[in-house]
Regions:
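Conserved AdoMet
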Residues: 2-114
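A short glycine-rich, Lys/Arg-flanked "PGG" loop and its adjoining helix->strand segment in the class I
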Residues: 236-248
Length: 291
């Protein structure tokens, strides 16, 4: 049977809620009604692939089939992979370099800096950060350990492969691009093994404390343009999980539209950067308990 039997462009309220509850349980991300068309298109794609003829049939497959684990991974992949690119938001990059990284390198000279890109997608932010260290000659002064994580298995696999479209690397400085990328067929370019070896990538669900704690402690956590996808309860859990990966003087960087005003018991603002905010852990003795 073919999914072409499904003719409605969007799901009705009952089955849509089943899917959104399922997604929320797995990821902490809440899909609102405005995302109905987007979600429906993804369900249709996977239904056609499996030869299923209704939204209900695919939902049943996701939740009861003995082989559902792999399909759940694929479904989460197609609804969570977001477009990104190298050197995204140049003012933000420059401010991060000048106001955060340079002082940190000076303070940690002769030591190690650990950075976590908490929702790294296909690795663009991770590799951009590595290039910042190379460009500024900081690797003579410190060793860098950088980890990228994402809930999407496909995104993490792509990050490890390090193959990108020309569009994704359009902002990379020519000196960097010429030295560390190799042109491929089909308007794609491959990152050098030398750079790929400097990063590690893991599949991590940010709302699962056992997964985030296993990463260890970091000097900087990058979590930009991610928290907007969580509701308040899930966001609080994610923030506590990030909190546990940070030292007292570590910094969390979020996007400019992601202020943490309602979570001052977890993080307190330190400085506003260009299109970004930097936060430190709230001091002990705040009014809400960390469970």
């Amino acid at each position: 049977m073919q999914a072409s039997g499904i003719t409605r462009p969007t799901m009705d309220g009952t089955i849509f809620k089943k899917y959104t509850d399922f997604i929320y349980d797995k990821t902490g991300i809440r899909f609102e009604e405005t995302k109905n068309y987007f979600l429906t298109s993804k369900v249709l794609r996977r239904s056609e692939k499996l030869g299923l003829d209704s939204y209900e049939a695919y939902y049943h497959y996701l939740t009861t089939n003995v082989d559902r684990r792999k399909e759940v991974e694929k479904f989460i992949d197609i609804i969570t992979i977001h477009e990104t690119f190298f050197y995204r938001n140049q003012p933000q990059i420059e401010s991060f370099e000048k106001d955060i990284l340079a002082p940190l390198v000076a303070r940690k000279k002769g030591g190690k800096i650990r950075i976590w890109s908490a929702a790294c997608s296909t690795g663009d932010e991770v590799y951009t950060t590595i290039f910042q260290f190379i460009w500024n000659g900081w690797l003579k002064d410190v060793s860098l350990e950088i980890t990228g994580s994402d809930i999407s298995h496909q995104a993490v696999e792509d990050a490890r492969k390090g193959v990108y479209t020309e569009y994704a690397v359009r902002n990379v400085p020519p000196e960097i691009k010429n030295k560390y990328f190799t042109q491929m067929e089909g308007r794609q370019t491959a990152l050098s093994d030398e750079i790929k070896k400097m990063a590690s990538f893991k599949v991590v669900n940010l709302k699962e404390p056992s997964q985030t704690r296993a990463l260890g402690k970091f000097d900087i956590v990058l979590c930009r343009n991610v928290l907007i996808y969580f509701d308040s309860a899930a966001k609080e859990q994610v923030l506590w999980n990030i909190y546990d990966t940070m030292e007292d003087n570590s910094l969390l960087l979020v996007g400019h539209s992601e202020n943490l005003y309602g979570f001052k018991h977890i993080f307190q603002a330190q400085k506003e950067l260009s299109n970004s905010f930097a936060y430190k852990k709230a001091p002990p003795g705040t009014e809400k308990l960390h469970v």
